[in-house]
């Protein structure tokens, strides 16, 4: 795929289109990072785009935040409180669900009135309520929704796991154990009513997410497609490994794995399976433990340091993309034993840096890693196969080939011009139905 040709073609037919990207945060979390990258991709490729957030972190002129007041914190606390009361006063799954019972009306804002297309991303935890979403849909403006998780097409959960109630009717949510009002049913029914007859397009970041969305009763009658998240391949690119290691204080003489997550202790991130895989390597691959180390990236990295049977090098959470790219280049392999994921930005970033990846066969991960071509896709929840994947990828005679293939795959699929072009087509289709 000639990405440069796509970018030129893209810019020649864009005429006066204004897009408002809406996300809870500007920089924190995978959805925020993806939304921010799309903002820059659109603006660099012929579309006038702005981003509206609740939690602003920079002074970027294209990023705007809603008026700040005590109500924002109150909205968040009120929503958590209602969930807590309907969950038998338990904190279990407190942040795995959202009921969108409080938020901010953005339809009155000048930024909303300015836009031709409203592009919603992750808007939970007290940013937009169901009432707010209803007003957005009722405005008559085309609405595009990027599915960073399942919330838009389930009742209240972000990931349904083995539950398939969202296909027909969410009720008696297995994530809540309280006997109060059926929150899942109430929210599902409300979404069903407000989606009906509206100019609404759903975009999954992965084919897996789009396929799940198509099975939901909530998306029937609406377009569902998939477009991957964009990445800046001029930032995330191959660099000198030893220079990167020196800068981050990492040993020059070891093969290094990288594991990272915003919350390493989040069970969905699968850290326990990485521990098991490393234990298997220590027992069954005697030559590796002497030369192998694990870099753990995340705010709570120190808390898991003792769990791994290999030397561990901790790095605090990095928000600067250039430093993150350096860290990917400093290691030999990125490992992501995630148990449930959509289209992890981390895999795309690592591949763009020429760093092969090992992950489980789950969610959108097998769409990203081509098994034994640019990385290794291990059997789901199989720590032994995960260990085999690590060993296989680290073989000196194949690592360079995997690295080159990973970079090529990232350029072909996730470069900003290619992703921006595909979103432009979605926007134009939505506008044609206005």
Task: Describe every region a protein language model picked out.
Residues 326-331:
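Short alpha-helical donor nucleotide-sugar binding micro-motif in glycosyltransferases
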Residues 371-372, 376-383, 392-397:
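Conserved acidic donor-binding segment of nucleotide-sugar-dependent glycosyltransferases
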Residues 285-291, 296-325:
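Nucleotide-activated donor-binding/catalytic signature segment of Leloir-type glycosyltransferases, i.e.
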Residues 251-269, 275-279:
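Conserved donor-binding/catalytic core segment of Leloir-type glycosyltransferases
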Residues 398-413, 419-425:
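A short, well-ordered alpha-helix in the C-terminal region of glycosyltransferases
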Residues 356-359:
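Short hydrophobic beta-strand element within catalytic cores of glycosyltransferases
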Residues 154-159, 178-224, 231-235, 241:
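A short, active-site helix/loop in glycosyltransferases that binds the activated sugar's phosphate group
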Residues 339:
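Aromatic "clamp/platform" in nucleotide-sugar-dependent glycosyltransferases that forms part
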């Amino acid at each position: 795929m000639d990405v440069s040709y796509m970018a030129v073609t893209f810019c020649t037919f864009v005429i006066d289109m204004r897009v408002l990207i809406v996300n809870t945060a500007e920089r924190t979390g995978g959805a925020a990072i993806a939304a921010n990258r799309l903002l820059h991709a659109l603006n660099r490729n012929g579309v006038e785009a702005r981003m509206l957030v609740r939690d602003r972190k920079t002074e970027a002129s294209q990023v705007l935040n809603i008026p700040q007041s005590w109500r924002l914190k109150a909205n968040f606390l009120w929503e958590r409180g209602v969930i807590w009361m309907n969950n038998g006063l338990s904190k279990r799954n407190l942040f795995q669900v959202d009921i969108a019972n409080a938020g901010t009306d953005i339809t009155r804002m000048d930024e909303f009135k300015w836009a031709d297309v409203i592009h919603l991303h992750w808007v939970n935890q007290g940013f937009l309520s169901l009432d707010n979403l209803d007003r957005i849909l009722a405005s008559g403006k085309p609405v595009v929704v990027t599915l960073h998780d399942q919330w838009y097409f389930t009742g209240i959960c972000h990931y349904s796991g083995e539950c398939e109630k969202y296909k027909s009717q969410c009720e008696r949510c297995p994530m809540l154990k309280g006997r109060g009002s059926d929150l899942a049913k109430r929210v599902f029914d409300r979404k069903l009513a407000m989606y009906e007859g509206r100019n609404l397009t759903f975009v999954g970041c992965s084919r897996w997410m789009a396929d799940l969305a198509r099975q939901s009763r909530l998306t029937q009658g609406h377009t569902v497609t998939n477009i991957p998240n964009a990445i800046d391949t001029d930032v995330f690119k191959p660099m000198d490994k030893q220079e990167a290691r020196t800068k981050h204080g990492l040993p020059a003489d070891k093969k290094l794995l990288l594991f990272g997550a915003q919350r390493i202790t989040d069970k969905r991130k699968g850290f326990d399976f990485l521990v098991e895989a490393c234990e298997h390597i220590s027992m069954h691959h005697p030559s590796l433990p002497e030369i192998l180390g694990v870099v753990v990236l995340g705010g709570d990295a120190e808390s898991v340091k003792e769990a791994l049977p290999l030397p561990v090098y901790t790095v605090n959470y990095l928000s600067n993309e250039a430093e993150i790219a350096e860290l990917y280049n400093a290691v030999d392999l990125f490992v992501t034993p995630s148990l449930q994921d959509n289209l992890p930005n981390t895999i795309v970033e690592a591949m763009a840096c020429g760093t092969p990846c090992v992950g489980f066969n789950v969610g959108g991960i097998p769409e990203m890693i081509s098994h034994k071509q640019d990385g290794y896709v291990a059997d789901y929840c199989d720590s032994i196969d995960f260990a085999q994947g690590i060993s296989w990828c680290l073989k000196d005679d194949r690592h360079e080939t995997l690295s080159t293939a990973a970079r090529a795959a990232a350029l072909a699929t996730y470069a900003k011009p290619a992703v921006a072009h595909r979103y432009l087509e979605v926007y134009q289709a939505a506008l044609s139905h206005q």
